[in-house]
Each structure stands twice: as C-alpha cells, then as structure tokens.
C-alpha cells in the first residue's frame, strides 16, 4: 500500500554564520519510499530534515512535497509527522492524549480522535499503556508512542530524526525493525536521519550518504555497499582497509591478485585500494610474507588483523570457526576476492 | 533502633520546636495584642472587625488585592511569552533579559520612585490618579523573583523539542504555548504568581512616597492611632501569605512526584538540544 507523496529538495543551502551546514543539497524521494540520510555529525543531515519539516529555513533552495512548493509554509501547516531524537512526549498528557494531540489541533471530534489514537497504539503494540504518562514508560516505549503520534495525523511525509540513538542496542534493533514494518504497512514517504550505517542499510529503500553539507551518493543499500562512488562513502559505509594497489586498464593489482577497479577510481598508476574486510582472504602459510597481528572475536564472526611485508595492517573478516586456527605471529598469505574495489590516490 | 537514629530524631524534634516557637511566637503575640481591649481590659474582636468596618482600611485592602491580581496578570503576560521566545528564538538575548529582570533588586525603592516620577506624570495624565497605576512599577519590582521561578521551570523541560513536536503536529505558536508549554511549567507560574502577590502585599515605600493608600500604607497610618487594628491587619496579611505558600506547596506536590518518576527514567544520551544541527 502506498499513501505517500513525492518529496523534492532542490539546491538547498543553509548557512549558520561561517558554517555552511547544507551546500546545494538536491534530493528526490519517491512516493512511499523510505530514504535514509547517513553521515557523521555536522554533515547537514539533520538540517536537511528540519528544513523539510519547516523547523528551520533554508538560506536558498526549495522544498516541494507532492508537487506543492512548501518552502515558505510554516511547520504547523506542512502535515508532516516527526519523531525526534530526544524524548518528545508531552509530559502532562497521557499516552492516548499524546497520540490524539495532532488530531485535536486539526479540530477532530473526541470520538474520532480517541478511535484513531487507539488504532495507532495498536499498530505499535502499546494499547495496554494508553492511560499512562510518559514518565511511566521506557525509552523504547516513548519512541513508539512518538511514532504512533506522528502517524496518527496521517502525515504526507514521516520524518525520523535519529529516533533510536537514545536507546540501548537491543531495543534499537527491535524498534528499527518495527519502524520499517509500520512504514511499509502505512506506506508513508519517509525520511530517516541517522549516523548509524547499520540502521540506515537495514531499513531504507535508498541511502544517501552526506558529507560537509553535500550528498556524496544516493543508492540502494546493496549498491552503496558494493559500489561506493567516492572514497568518503567507501570509508564511511562499512570498515575498510587501505591497501597499496596499481591501476591499469580498469584493473587493480593488489595483494597478488588483479580485480576490477570501480568507477570513480584513478585511471592509472599507484594508489590505495579500499578493500572490505570480508573481501580479504587469509591463508595459513609457513612461507607467507605476512603475519597475524591479532584476532578479535565478535561472536559469530571474527576479525583477523595481519601485517604485510611493507608494514601495512589489513583486517580480514571471517567466521569465528575459521579464525580459530590463527594466532598472533603466525605466518600467513593475504589475498583479496575478485570483487571490484575503489582505488583512490595515495594522498586521498 | 540504634542510638544514632534516636539522637537524630531527638535533635530533629528539638529543632522543630525551636524553629516553631521562633516563627509562631511573634504571630501569637500579634494575635494576643490584636484581641486585647486596651481601655477596659479583657478581650475584644473590635480590631478585626475594623478590617471590614473601617472604610479607608477596607478600601486599602481591596486596592492591594487588585494590585496583586493586576501585577500577577501583567507580569505573566509579559514575562512568560518573552522567556519562551528568548529560549527558542533568541538565546543570545538570555543574558540581557536576565540582567534586566534582576536589575530592580539592585535599585533602592527610593531611587525607583524618584526615577519614575516623570514617567508617572504621563501615566497619571492618561490613566488618572488611581492607586492601581502602581501595577506598572510593581511589575518591575516582582521581575527578579518571577524571572527566577519561571527560569527554573523552563530549564526543567526540553522546551525546544516539546514546542517543535507540537508545531509539527499542527499547533500554532499560541496553541503550543497554551497547550504544551504552560501546563508543563505550571508549578513555576504558580511560584512566580504567589511570590509576586507576597511582594505586592508587602510593599510600602513606593506606595507611600507616591501618595497612594495601599494596605501597608494604611497599616502604618492606623498604627499611629489604633495599635490593635494595625497589628490585626498585619497578621491578616501574614496569614494570607502563609496560606498562599501552603496552597503553592499543595498544588505543586503532585508535579514534584511526577518529576521524581521522570528522574528515574534514563534520559537520552545523545540528545541534540542546542547549537547548530548536524
């Protein structure tokens, strides 16, 4: 089911004194799509969301939702539901009154308000808590109520501003999955802002990676992971090894293998290849020129760190059962799987 | 029960009694004096009856109560939206507003009266020679106390997030303040209001030097001729103040309990509350 509308951010710029928080951001979101904006602190992702919500004003550029220009429309007239990073339930209202608040502002009668609020609470599984106050709920429950409250008004766009960052790891994963389930169920166009790459890759239809106010790459999670367009994306999304490589004829030679160089790589010469730990292979070899530095156990997987003959440290990710055979100091041969790699200039 | 806790309880009991006597004895003395018949001996309630039978005193009580009400209303109308606006839209102005609000504490009443004389010529020209025009100067006088009470209440809530949540749900600025902010700073508003009432009912210098007959001015005047009535009026004002504080404590008790529950719930660890958004 798709209830969503398209969203168009065009050439958005936002300047705070000497700081350029957004630098010509252009983003198109399809109806019903969930797009995650991912990036480090200060990259402009929250600024973009706040401008879309009407809580901040762009220095230049335009915001359009469903073909309607909303650039100068105030926040309370935009029909957008928002879940904030900080707990935002109104402390003086019960859960059900919180969820019904937006409907009250729209002049709905009490019966309709309560019925819709109960419907939303059922959607997020909190019907039993309808008469409690925010202070009586856990952090995860508060954010679920905030989600129900944002959806109760049947918003044209749902905005999620790092809604999970205040929660502990287990609740974060549960709520992340729940947000995706609910979003798919109601079909609302959604913009999700996060600095957690795992969160973004897990829930989004497309992920936009931002750096210094600019959109570096916007792509489906698998595409973004496999084919990063820029060194920043390669580095920010997933762990990366930087391994010396030689590029010629679209092929990169590294770790004794020749693999395709991804678009965006240097055209020829020496550079650094961005290699994912899962693409690195380690083989026990008494005559190997590399040696195991350390083994990090991470549950089902382990990371084996090796030092190459030239001193470069490379991390390989493998099943813990496979990593058991390695101990620090063991001589090994390090290789790379024949997937594409991005090769950047050695100074980059 | 060990000796330490018994000793602690004893000490607490002794302190309770000592402080109780310290505060209650003057009140008892006032009550005793105000019910004495100084001419014939024995007891009389004439001084208390004078509070409503003496026309000048009765008028002064009404004027003082009206001044208290008008001062509280005007103070809240000016201060609450201003403080909310400063916190949300102009945090750079917070220091200036705080300085201006606290300034009256540092200026003697006599200086205020002299300074306001010219201003009050205009006030009298437009509004007449009513004692109720003291409302304006009283609003200035209560600013330091009201500011502190409201500032504490506003600091206790995440004003930015709550108001942005309300606006994103369709509330305009007035609805945001009336339906979301005010209910969550209610205890601060009550504190500011009650402290302001206490200040207004206790103010003498400005009213006296400005020539207006407020309750305190009347108490001093009556005290020159009729001691018991003057003391009865003073005691009534004191008891009224105590009752106000008691009501304040009762009204905010429930909210303090809620606050205690709030404190037990883990707060966001990485909440963005201010500064340039990411």
Residue map of PLM features:
Chain A
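Helix-to-loop junction immediately C-terminal to a conserved catalytic motif
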Residues: 53
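ABC ATPase nucleotide-binding domains
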Residues: 34, 75-232
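ATPase nucleotide-binding modules
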Residues: 229-273, 277-293, 305-325
């Amino acid at each position: 089911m798709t209830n969503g509308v398209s969203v168009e951010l065009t050439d958005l710029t936002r300047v705070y004194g000497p700081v350029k928080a957004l630098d010509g951001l252009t983003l198109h979101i399809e109806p019903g799509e969930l797009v995650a904006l991912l990036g480090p602190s200060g990259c402009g992702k929250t600024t973009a969301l706040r401008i879309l919500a009407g809580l901040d004003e762009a220095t230049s550029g335009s915001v359009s939702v469903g073909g309607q220009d909303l650039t100068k429309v105030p926040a309370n007239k935009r029909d957008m539901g928002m879940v904030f990073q900080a707990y935002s339930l109104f402390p003086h209202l019960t859960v059900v009154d919180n969820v019904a608040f937006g409907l009250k502002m729209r002049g709905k009668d009490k019966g309709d308000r309560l019925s819709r609020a109960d419907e939303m609470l059922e959607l997020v599984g909190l019907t039993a808590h309808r008469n409690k106050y925010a202070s009586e709920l856990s952090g995860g429950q508060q954010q679920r109520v905030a989600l129900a409250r944002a959806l109760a008004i049947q918003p044209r766009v749902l905005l999620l501003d790092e809604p999970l960052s205040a929660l502990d790891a287990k609740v974060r994963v549960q709520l992340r999955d729940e947000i995706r389930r609910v979003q798919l169920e109601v079909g609302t166009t959604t913009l999700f802002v996060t600095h957690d790459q795992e969160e973004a890759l897990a829930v989004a239809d497309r992920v936009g990676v931002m750096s210094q106010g600019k959109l570096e790459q916007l792509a489906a999670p698998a595409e973004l992971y496999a084919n990063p367009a820029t060194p920043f994306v390669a580095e920010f999304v997933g762990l990366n090894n930087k391994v010396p490589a030689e590029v010629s004829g679209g092929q990169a030679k590294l770790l004794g293998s020749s693999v395709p160089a991804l678009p965006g790589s240097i055209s020829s010469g020496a550079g650094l290849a961005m290699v994912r730990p899962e693409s690195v292979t380690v083989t026990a070899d008494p005559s190997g020129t590399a040696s195991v530095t350390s083994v990090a156990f991470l549950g089902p997987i382990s990371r084996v760190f090796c030092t190459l003959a030239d001193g470069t440290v490379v991390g390989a990710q493998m099943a813990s059962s496979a990593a058991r055979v390695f101990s620090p100091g063991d001589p090994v041969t390090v290789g790379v799987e024949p997937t594409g790699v991005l090769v950047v200039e050695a100074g980059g | 029960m060990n000796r330490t806790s018994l000793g602690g309880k004893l000490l607490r009991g002794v302190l309770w009694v000592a402080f109780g006597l310290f505060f209650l004895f003057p009140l008892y003395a006032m009550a005793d004096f105000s019910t004495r018949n100084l001419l014939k001996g024995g007891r009389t309630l004439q001084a208390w009856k004078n509070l409503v039978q003496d026309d000048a005193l009765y008028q002064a009580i009404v004027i003082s109560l009206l001044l208290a009400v008008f001062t509280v209303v005007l103070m809240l109308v000016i201060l609450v939206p201003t403080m909310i606006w400063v916190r949300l839209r102009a945090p750079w102005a917070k220091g200036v507003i705080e300085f201006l609000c606290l300034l009256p504490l540092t200026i003697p009443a006599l200086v205020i009266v002299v300074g306001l004389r010219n201003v009050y010529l205009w006030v009298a020209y437009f509004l007449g020679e009513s004692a109720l025009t003291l409302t304006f100067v009283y609003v200035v006088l209560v600013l330091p106390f009201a500011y502190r009470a409201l500032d504490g209440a506003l600091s206790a809530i995440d004003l930015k997030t709550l108001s942005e949540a309300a606006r994103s749900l369709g509330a305009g600025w007035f609805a945001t303040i009336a339906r979301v902010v005010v209910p969550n700073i209610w205890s601060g508003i009550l504190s500011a209001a009650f402290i302001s009432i206490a200040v207004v009912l206790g103010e003498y210098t400005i009213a006296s030097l400005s020539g207006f007959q407020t309750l305190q001015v009347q108490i001093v005047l009556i005290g020159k001729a009729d001691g018991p009535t003057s003391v009865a009026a003073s005691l009534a004002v004191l008891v009224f103040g105590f009752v106000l504080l008691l009501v304040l404590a009762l009204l905010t008790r429930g909210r303090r309990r809620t606050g205690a529950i709030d404190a037990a719930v883990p707060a966001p660890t990485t909440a963005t509350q201010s500064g340039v958004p990411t």
